[in-house]
From Swiss-Prot:
A GO cellular component annotation in the UniProt record: proton-transporting ATP synthase complex
Cellular location(s): Cell inner membrane
Organism: Syntrophotalea carbinolica (strain DSM 2380 / NBRC 103641 / GraBd1) (Pelobacter carbinolicus)
Keywords: ATP synthesis, Cell inner membrane, Cell membrane, CF(1), Hydrogen ion transport, Ion transport, Membrane, Transport
Any matching Pfam family: OSCP
Membrane topology: Peripheral membrane protein
Annotated family: Belongs to the ATPase delta chain family.
UniProt-recorded name of the protein: ATP synthase subunit delta 1
A Gene Ontology molecular function term of the record: proton-transporting ATP synthase activity, rotational mechanism
Oligomer and partners: F-type ATPases have 2 components, F(1) - the catalytic core - and F(0) - the membrane proton channel. F(1) has five subunits: alpha(3), beta(3), gamma(1), delta(1), epsilon(1). F(0) has three main subunits: a(1), b(2) and c(10-14). The alpha and beta chains form an alternating ring which encloses part of the gamma chain. F(1) is attached to F(0) by a central stalk formed by the gamma and epsilon chains, while a peripheral stalk is formed by the delta and b chains.
Origin: domain of life: Bacteria
Function, in words: F(1)F(0) ATP synthase produces ATP from ADP in the presence of a proton or sodium gradient. F-type ATPases consist of two structural domains, F(1) containing the extramembraneous catalytic core and F(0) containing the membrane proton channel, linked together by a central stalk and a peripheral stalk. During catalysis, ATP synthesis in the catalytic domain of F(1) is coupled via a rotary mechanism of the central stalk subunits to proton translocation.
Coiled coil: none
Amino acid sequence: MKSTAISRRYAKALVNLAAPDGQLESTYAQLEQLQQAFACEPRLYKLLASPTLAADKIAGLLEGISNYLQLSTTLRNLLGLLQQRQRLEYFDALVADYRELADVQLGLVRARVCSAAPLDAAVQQAISAQLQKRYGKQAVLELAVEPELLGGVRIEVAGQVLDGTIRSGLRRMAGYLNS
């Protein structure tokens, strides 16, 4: 989901609450857990955002979810606030914004690394070291295997795409031959 001024504001407030206690990563883990719960049961998400359901019923549902997932008091309060202000629709964007803001605080850069086959630990370490050198931050790799790439690696980091795949090389070569 796309970031909005609303989601960014809530994410920033949550980072400001979590940072002093060193809870940035654990708060993100809980947000991700809640996001997965909503993804597994989309009807629940729609039910919570429904204007026709009584507020006390929604509060009860949120309490049950919070207890089941063992959410922190801060996240329980956030959920209640989002529900009360009818802003649950911004939750996915809030999670993405939170991760981005928390990464800045923690000095991290996230990179999505796609390859045709799984990368061994040495290659992962080399990629991580190069990204750390280039961006001056510790790199967190999110690995994905995409067999259609044929070979090589495509890295998406900080709004840039570094494409060293065989597929893109063949595409460039075809472009040269056709022109």
